[in-house]
Amino acid sequence: MELSRRKMCCYIQFCCFVLIGCFISQICASSDAIFYESFDESFEGSWIVSEKEDYPGEWKHSKSEGHDDYGLLVSDKARKYAIVKELEKPVELKDGTIVLQYEVRLQNGLECGGAYLKYLRPQDAGWTAKGFDNESPYSIMFGPDKCGATNKVHFILKHKNPKSGDYVEHHLKFPPSVPSDKLTHVYTAVIKPDNELVILIDGEEKKKANFLSSEDFEPALIPTKTIPDPDDKKPEDWDERAKIPDPEATKPDDWDEDAPMEILDEEAEKPEGWLDDEPEEIDDPEAVKPEDWDDEEDGEWEAPQIENPKCESAPGCGEWRRPLKRNPAYKGKWHAPLIDNPAYKGIWKPREIPNPDYFELEKPNFEPIAAIGIEDLDQQDGILFDNILIASDEKTAAKSGILLGSRSLRWKKRNRRLKKNQPLLDGLKGIQKAVFDVLYKIADLPFLGDHKVKVLELIEKAETQPNITIGVIVSIIVVIFSILLKLLFGGKKAAPKVNVVPKKKEEPEASNTAEVREGEEEKTEGEVAAAPRRRPRRDT
């Protein structure tokens, strides 16, 4: 009895640690997520659709195909779309790490169109969200774009020249390609305080760059110190020829420029059996003049030609001619040999002068993000945007990507495992049954009292799912131990009723066991922050 009591206390302590860790993780995540849009609720009133005539495309609050999760959907083909969300407070990019992340699913593929986001800088006075269009100034443009030869994940920084005051688009060189499947993918851009940029797709690093490197951005953020002098001109006597014909060379006396390249082969002989009197083609004896043929209008009718059947067994027909062969005396046009040019000065270049627009830069002049917009002409429908996140911590975004966005990768692996490990999965079905048997026995414990009905309801709900989930089992255990805690430490006070039925909004948390196991295998030990709460969905 004493041993059982000790085990019970250990279980209680373990569950307490788990609950405390979850609370701390949630607090950390909420503080690091500057902006998060899950599209669980309708976007109307929060996201503003452009009222410009150029953007007739209709946005829809729709579920992803085969999922219970909602997103922002491009609903029609060959339409221009524009929608924007103004942030409560502009996000500064100059200090600390900033993570830009979102999910997109190309449900019908992407032949020609974009699925990128525009992170708008503060607009001029008088600008309204209803007037959002392609001229609305942005700070960063990020996301997939594909059309014709273009197939890349854009990252464009619109940077203000500190000398001229002009804004210049700086494109990331050699960006990663867009995944070609129709699954959900997470696109992440991490802007670090050391001027480093990291692009990830589904949590996997695809590109690393430095904002101040001329090898990573075109044009470079920092201009060159010198430029070619636009007023400098090449001297008239400047000789750029490295080689010249030898002026002292003469053509040899035996060099015949008129000799032909080919001559008749005088040694050739006509093959035996050659039919000199037989033509190579003859009139088709089976051809008949058409009845509607009019000689006056169509001309004299002639039978079509066919190959002479007599020539098939002979080496040839018709007049025999000697074949040609290469002329051994042929040398072609004579040219003087080339020698080094004594007057050669090299390829002329204008002299370099100090660049009047040069400036030094320790950090890019990032403009704040005041709004997030989607604006493009899409030839495909079925583009679904979801889980748009701006965070100040990489772990928050990484956790979000692993738990919410890397479904495509996890489900590919899962499907491979289902085929490979079918015998193992058959064994797991027996384990599932045993687990539910234990849970039903726990539900019959006397101390549950009034809570027994709720616990049974939750167990039955989990059992009716296609596959049980670890999340549901853990929830049941936590509820039971929470009741036990109150019984042990709550004194004589009546235990309040516990609502153990998950909220309707969070019911989809009971997702597939294999998916959860897959997520657990992919988690790394360094993850400590949790993503904003979100209903998971699966890709099929």
Curated annotation (Swiss-Prot):
GO cellular component annotations of the record: endoplasmic reticulum membrane
4 X approximate repeats, as annotated region: 229-295, 299-356
Gene Ontology terms for molecular function: calcium ion binding; carbohydrate binding; unfolded protein binding
Region (P domain (Extended arm)): 227-360
Intracellular or extracellular location(s): Endoplasmic reticulum membrane
Region described as Disordered: 221-301, 499-540
Biased composition (Basic and acidic residues): 228-253
Binding site for an alpha-D-glucoside: 116, 118, 138, 145, 375
Example GO biological process: protein folding
Stretches in topological domain Cytoplasmic: 491-540
Stretch forming the signal peptide: 1-29
Pfam families: Calreticulin (PF00262)
Tagged with keyword Signal: yes
InterPro entries reported for this sequence: Calret/calnex, Calret/calnex_CS, Calreticulin/calnexin_P_dom_sf, ConA-like_dom_sf
Positions annotated with a glycan in the UniProt record: 467
Membrane topology: Single-pass type I membrane protein
Record keywords, A-Z: Calcium, Chaperone, Disulfide bond, Endoplasmic reticulum, Glycoprotein, Lectin, Membrane, Metal-binding, Repeat, Signal, Transmembrane, Transmembrane helix
Start-end of Acidic residues biased regions: 254-285, 292-301
Function statement: Calcium-binding protein that interacts with newly synthesized monoglucosylated glycoproteins in the endoplasmic reticulum. It may act in assisting protein assembly and/or in the retention within the ER of unassembled protein subunits. It seems to play a major role in the quality control apparatus of the ER by the retention of incorrectly folded proteins.
Protein name per Swiss-Prot or TrEMBL: Calnexin homolog
The species this protein was found in: Helianthus tuberosus (Jerusalem artichoke)
